[in-house]
Design a protein with these regions (language model features):
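Conserved C-terminal structural/oligomerization subdomain of aldehyde/semialdehyde dehydrogenase
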Residues: 220, 271, 317-459
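Residues at or immediately preceding the N-termini of alpha-helices
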Residues: 6, 25, 43, 227, ...
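N-terminal Rossmann-like NAD(P)+-binding subdomain of aldehyde/semialdehyde dehydrogenases
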Residues: 1-101
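Hydrophobic packing residues within well-ordered alpha-helices of enzyme cores
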Residues: 149-152, 178, 198, 262, ...
Length: 459
């Protein structure tokens, strides 16, 4: 799609937004219902596209993308009317005989730039929030998941007028053309370097942005943890989508006292989940493309492999791999892995573990396995990270009742459920004041008696 076509799409959506059609709550709900029905109708196509792009099994496709997206859309449908109503606020004495309220209004013409690793979930969830809030939307899916992008375009073309929602496929040229346009809101999910570029381009028009980025999310296991449960949940979170998950445990920090037992249990769980030959397992996915495959494989140090390590370039598959005895200056610790490699480091004290994490860029997620509530609270309260779990991994994403987002280097802003609606809304504060009483204290000319009254009310 060329620059002129993109400019026309944005212009058409801006003209449509100015008709105020998206302000009607029933119209928003109807749009969400159409989206839900289109996703349901295309479930086989979605599953096939995910198998093509990422090798995902149908079970994983439904659990992590189709079903989760439908749940979020259903949540938005159920609550959009209540969220859209004005919210009454208390009035102080300065605004006596007034009604004070906040009114959520849509930003306008919005851009959603989606990633390739969960191409439906990470497109449909922000889309549902944007529609619930009353915006028009241009979606730019990733060129690295072409089969999924094509199905997304088909879903949106069937469900929406292009003046409301349009999908723009393509690569870097289309990204550049889109970022040259003036948007009222940009929602980006992807890498930290690209997120910085998006924010820089958005700043030229002072466009607000939500950035869902990534980072090296730590998983801490102390000596009190239920190791069997920890092993199963770590294996699930790490090797789901073959590690291509923004909140996957990136590395393991384990107390030296339980190191050997925990690694033995994780190895057992990997074999139980994927078999003795995971590269032959049809339900075990593949790396998205050859470039990413080469990068991830290059992070494997053969001298530190204690599980897996084998890669098959023809199918873009890499075994679930554990690296033990990893040092902080190893290559695998210098970047987000985004693949099926789990580096293992040890600590002697909680102070050592906390310092190791806080000396690095703020991660998107953190996971602490411990039966000690004081330890749990220490990491939850005092270590900066976007969100996380106690005695589990990645499940803080699987709800519409809490927001999800990063901080610092892992992003800004939140979405899911109410937070999605708020992310795509501007809150207007309105004072509606009666005219039957007009207190004179604030008006010039000022006098000492007026000043006394003002001090009674404002102090």
């Amino acid at each position: 799609m060329n620059t002129e076509e993109i400019a026309r799409i944005v212009g058409d959506q801006r003209a449509y937004f100015k008709t105020h059609a998206t302000f009607d709550v029933d119209a928003r709900r109807c749009a969400l219902v159409r989206l839900r029905e289109a996703v349901r109708a295309h479930e086989p196509d979605i599953a096939h596209a995910l198998k093509t792009d990422l090798g995902k099994s149908h079970d994983e496709a439904y659990m992590c993308e189709i079903g989760t997206s439908l749940s979020e859309i259903r949540h938005q449908i159920a609550h959009v009317a209540r969220w859209s109503r004005p919210r009454l606020r208390p009035c102080d004495l300065a605004n006596a005989v007034s009604v004070c309220k906040t009114q959520a209004v849509p930003y306008g013409v919005t851009l959603i730039m989606a990633p390739w690793n969960y191409p439906f979930l990470l497109t449909l969830e922000p889309l549902a929030g944007a529609l619930a809030a009353g915006n028009t939307v241009v979606i730019k899916p990733s060129a690295y998941a072409p089969a999924s992008s094509a199905v997304l375009r088909q879903i949106c073309e069937e469900a929406f007028d292009p003046c409301l929602v349009t999908v723009v496929e393509g690569g870097r040229a289309e990204n550049e053309a889109l970022l040259d346009e003036r948007w009222d809101k940009i929602f980006f999910t992807g890498s930290v370097p690209v997120g910085k570029l998006v924010m820089e381009r958005a700043s030229k028009n002072l466009t607000p942005v939500t950035l869902e980025l990534g980072g090296k999310s730590p998983c801490i296991v102390d000596a009190t943890a239920n190791l069997k449960v920890a092993a199963r949940r770590i294996a699930f979170g790490k090797w789901l989508n073959v590690g291509q998950t923004c909140v996957a445990p990136d590395y393991l920090l384990v107390d030296t006292r339980v190191h050997d037992e925990l690694l033995g249990l994780i190895k057992e769980e990997v074999r139980r989940m994927f078999g003795e030959h995971p590269l032959d397992n049809e339900d075990y996915g593949h790396i998205v493309n050859a470039k990413h495959f080469a990068r991830v494989r290059g992070l494997i140090d053969p001298d530190k492999v204690v599980l897996g390590g084998t890669a098959r370039e023809a199918s873009l598959k890499i075994e679930p791999t554990i690296l033990d005895g990893v040092a902080s200056d190893d290559a695998v610790m210098q970047e987000e892995i985004f693949g099926p490699i789990l580096p293992v480091l040890t600590f002697e004290s909680l102070d050592e573990a906390e310092t190791f994490i806080t000396d690095r860029p703020t991660p998107l997620a953190l996971y602490i396995f411990s039966q000690d509530r004081a330890v749990q609270q220490r990491f939850v309260r005092y270590v900066p990270f976007g969100g996380g779990c106690v005695n589990d991994t990645i499940m803080h994403l699987a709800t519409s009742h809490m927001g999800f987002g990063g901080m610092g280097a892992s992003g800004m802003g939140q979405y899911h459920g109410r937070e999605s609606f708020d992310t795509f809304s501007h809150k207007k504060s309105i004072v509606n004041k009666a005219t039957w009483l007009d207190v004179p204290f604030r008006y010039a000319p000022y006098a000492s008696w007026k000043h006394k009254f003002v001090r009674m009310f404002v102090h």
